[in-house]
């Protein structure tokens, strides 16, 4: 019995190629590069190589072990070379992309010919590989749904995947003294650079209807630190990220636990030439300047309050 795919003409595969190929040459704006969208982007490697090999299989019926080996070797060489070139030109090289390429090749080879007894395990293994590579996407999709369901909580760090939405030297860890409390926080390593901190993006952007931004901070050190909170909306890029076009405020991180509240009216009125668009908040950042030595801080319970 032929598979569902084999009952479809090869133009389905070619049509998918036409739809997928342009995306390899599109430069996404930074504001669009959410972890979830990048995970979808990664899966396009599987779809692309599957479509190419499936179309070749439909036309030439590659069934010998030698032909399969040659196709796989060629795909590995091409994909690996592209990743090496990207690494040498300052772009991110990813062997995960090579694994996705090879999974697409394997799927195309195994499903592009008529059913045969010897193909059964190839198809099972290729399907398992596909499922494994879908796990990060599924985790991010589930986390995204949970983040919207938990809003106005922006982040509480009880889900490991949540760290994907933060930029900086950060990790999710237990706070010293609370290791047995089943509570986690964002561990931030600050260095001695002129500006050292972190940024939070791709959270629910509509902050209208709330009055305060709240978060907690634990400073395990013995000295107070001067920190800066900055918030901007999606239109901030149009100003060239001018200082006067965003919200900036200093606050003190005293030793031990600290709780902070910042009025959203102040964020609304912060830009000098316009109002902040509270329906399109894009980035929240916290940083310090010119530390004499590295410092570790813990942040928790980012949320909006009525």
What are these regions, as identified by a protein language model?
Residues 1-96, 102, 107-195, 201-205, ...:
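Bulky hydrophobic segments
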Residues 194, 223, 237, 270, ...:
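Residue-level signal for secondary-structure boundary sites
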Residues 215, 259-302:
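Extracellular beta-strand ligand-recognition surfaces/modules
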Residues 217-221:
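Asparagine-centered strand-capping/turn motif at beta-strand->loop junctions
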Residues 305-306:
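Short, solvent-exposed mixed-charge patches
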């Amino acid at each position: 019995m032929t598979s569902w795919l084999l009952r479809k003409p090869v133009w389905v595969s070619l049509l998918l190629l036409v739809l997928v190929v342009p995306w390899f040459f599109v430069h996404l704006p930074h504001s669009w590069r959410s972890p979830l969208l990048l995970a979808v982007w990664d899966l396009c490697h599987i779809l692309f190589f599957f479509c190419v090999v499936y179309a070749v299989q439909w036309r030439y019926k590659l069934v010998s072990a030698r032909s399969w080996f040659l196709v796989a070797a060629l795909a590995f060489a091409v994909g690996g070379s592209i990743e090496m070139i990207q690494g040498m030109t300052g772009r991110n090289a990813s062997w995960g992309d090579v694994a996705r390429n090879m999974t697409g090749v394997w799927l195309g080879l195994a499903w592009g010919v008529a059913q045969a007894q010897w193909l059964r395990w190839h198809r099972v293994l290729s399907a398992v590989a596909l499922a494994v590579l879908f796990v990060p996407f599924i985790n991010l999709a589930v986390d995204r749904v949970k983040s919207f369901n938990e809003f106005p909580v922006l982040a509480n760090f009880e889900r490991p995947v949540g760290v994907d939405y933060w930029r900086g030297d950060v990790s999710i860890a237990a706070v010293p003294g609370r290791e047995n409390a089943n509570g986690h926080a964002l561990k931030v390593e600050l260095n001695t650079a002129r500006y050292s901190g972190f940024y939070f993006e791709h959270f629910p952007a509509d902050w209208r209807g709330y009055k305060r931004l709240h978060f907690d901070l634990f400073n395990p050190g013995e000295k107070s630190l001067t920190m800066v909170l900055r918030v901007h909306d999606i239109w901030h890029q149009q100003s060239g990220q001018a200082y006067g076009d965003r919200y900036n405020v200093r606050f003190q991180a005293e030793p031990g636990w600290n709780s902070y509240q910042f009025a959203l009216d102040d964020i609304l009125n912060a830009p000098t030439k316009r109002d902040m668009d509270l329906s399109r908040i894009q980035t929240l950042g916290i940083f310090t300047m010119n530390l004499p030595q590295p410092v570790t801080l813990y942040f928790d319970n980012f949320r909006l309050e009525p």
